[in-house]
Design a protein with these regions (language model features):
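Beta-strand-loop-alpha-helix segment that lines the small-molecule cofactor/substrate pocket
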Residues: 1-5
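Gly/Ser/Thr-rich loops at beta-strand to alpha-helix junctions
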Residues: 8-14, 39-40
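Active-site-proximal alpha-helical scaffold in enzymes
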Residues: 14-24
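C-terminal catalytic/substrate-binding lobe primarily of soluble NAD(P)-dependent oxidoreductases
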Residues: 22-211
Length: 211
């Protein structure tokens, strides 16, 4: 038996969506940005995984922690730092903010890009990937992003033991109604090295984590 990590909602839509978007332009790519939105629930197992992230070593804060050795340029490291960006994205017709799984997804996509380059099929010289949440209003982007920052601070502190007991436990999950009414969408903005830009999207019906 093999365990294949990062093959669910985190991080397949980001990884496959980036690969697909780049293939559509079929030329060297400078940058891909994705803006994710979704509706659904969280199981106790997922919440337990999120809370366990508070134990991760400082090395996990490295945007290229999953990359093979010597596959990161100075330009890539400068342009790929985790950041809070609240702005109107006209191509997506959404406001950007922090994405719930962006810390995990960005590392996976950057690793895939590095492996493609090692296989003599690079996405582009100094390729940069960034991920954000997509929100309907500036207020939603600000308050959700602040809520996520607060959540990350809690799971890194002793307070997490107090908060954890009030959330779903392992074995518990979203109801059938929540799973049926769920959905997800990712909007990818791809910029080629020659300046051409293209917008692609990936979407699905049903809870992205459990259907």
């Amino acid at each position: 038996m093999r365990v294949i990590p990062s093959c669910g909602y985190d991080s397949l839509p980001s990884d496959i969506g980036t690969f697909f978007s780049i293939k559509q332009l079929n030329k060297p790519i400078k940058k891909v940005e994705v803006f994710h939105s979704a509706a659904g629930g969280a199981s106790g197992g997922t919440i337990e995984s999120i809370f366990s992230m508070g134990k991760l070593p400082k090395e996990m804060r490295d945007p290229f922690v999953l990359n093979p050795k010597d596959t990161v340029s100075d330009i890539q490291r400068k342009e790929s730092q985790d950041s809070l960006s609240i702005r109107w994205v006209k191509e997506a017709k959404k406001w950007s903010g922090i994405g719930l799984f962006s810390v995990a997804n960005t590392r996976v996509v950057r690793r895939s890009a590095a492996l493609m380059e090692l296989n003599q099929n690079p996405y582009g010289k100094n390729f940069v990937f960034k991920e954000y949440g997509a929100y309907s209003s500036r207020r939603a982007a600000i308050f959700t992003s602040l809520g996520l920052i607060l959540s990350f601070l809690i799971i890194s502190s002793p307070l997490k033991r107090l908060v954890r007991r009030f959330l779903p436990q392992p074995g518990e999950g979203p109801s059938e109604e929540v799973r049926e009414k769920g959905w997800f969408r990712g909007i990818f903005i791809t910029e080629a090295e020659d300046g051409e830009r293209q917008v692609t999207s990936i979407y699905g019906d049903g809870d992205p984590g459990y259907k």
